[in-house]
Amino acid sequence: MESNPPDSTGPMHVPFGHIVANEKWRGSQLAQGMQGKIKLVFEDGLTPVDFYLSSKSCILYITEAELVAGNGYRKRLVRVRNSNKLQGIVVVEKTQMSEQYFPAVQKFTVLDLGMVLLPVASQMEASCLIIQLVQEQTREPSKNPFLRKKRALVSEPALLRSVQQIPGVGKVKAPLLLQRFPSIQQLSNASLRELEAVVGPAAAQRIHAFFSQPR
């Protein structure tokens, strides 16, 4: 298995249909939830990445404890975001304890970095989500849901679920918005009038307000 030097954001060789996991997750509930359902390989020196789903797509996982503790997770996100070699999505534990901190991480991840953010209630839910995304990628490798494209596909589960979390959107409006604005970047640059034409004035106000926050 080819691996990166410590603290690297370079590509990783990942066999098709496998997940390469950071050694720190060995024995965790998250890893146990995936074992037996997908081929999991542990590697040292994956910092700042937690899981590689393909050679250029990865997951950055923010635990409840990390979210409550402060903004220490931000450096990891920025390093992957600034890498031209990796496309990362962020999975965050949104629990009763950490829920009050979710708007801040959402603003930083989606608004400031333009990255996909997926909230989960537990590590077991996260394991199911990661398996689902890898299976989606395995079924349709040409429609890799982690790779940023000029035009995103509405069926991409990661992008769709991330947009659903934006205030004022939800499950019904997210596909409509992605048909008109195929990426988070395009959605963030949409005018209030353009948003109103898709989702109506009330939802448009909330969405526009989210993307108009000071950065």
Curated annotation (Swiss-Prot):
One MF annotation (Gene Ontology) recorded for this entry: DNA binding
Alphabetical UniProt keywords: DNA damage, DNA repair, DNA-binding, Nucleus
Protein's job: Plays a role in DNA repair through recruitment of the FA core complex to damaged DNA. Regulates FANCD2 monoubiquitination upon DNA damage. Induces chromosomal instability as well as hypersensitivity to DNA cross-linking agents, when repressed. Targets FANCM/FAAP24 complex to the DNA, preferentially to single strand DNA.
Gene3D superfamilies (UniProt xref): 3.40.50.10130, 5' to 3' exonuclease, C-terminal subdomain
Predominant subcellular localization, coarse grouping: nucleus
InterPro entries assigned: DisA/LigA_HHH, FAAP24, PND, RuvA_2-like
Organism expressing this protein natively: Bos taurus (Bovine)
GO biological process, alphabetically ordered: interstrand cross-link repair
Domains: entry comment: The C-terminal region is distantly related to RuvA domain 2, a DNA-binding domain.
Name of the protein in its database record: Fanconi anemia core complex-associated protein 24
Location of this chain's protein in the cell: Nucleus
One GO CC term, this protein: Fanconi anaemia nuclear complex
Keyword Repeat tagged: no
Record text on subunit structure and interactions: Belongs to the multisubunit FA complex composed of FANCA, FANCB, FANCC, FANCE, FANCF, FANCG, FANCL/PHF9, FANCM and FAAP24. Interacts with FANCM.
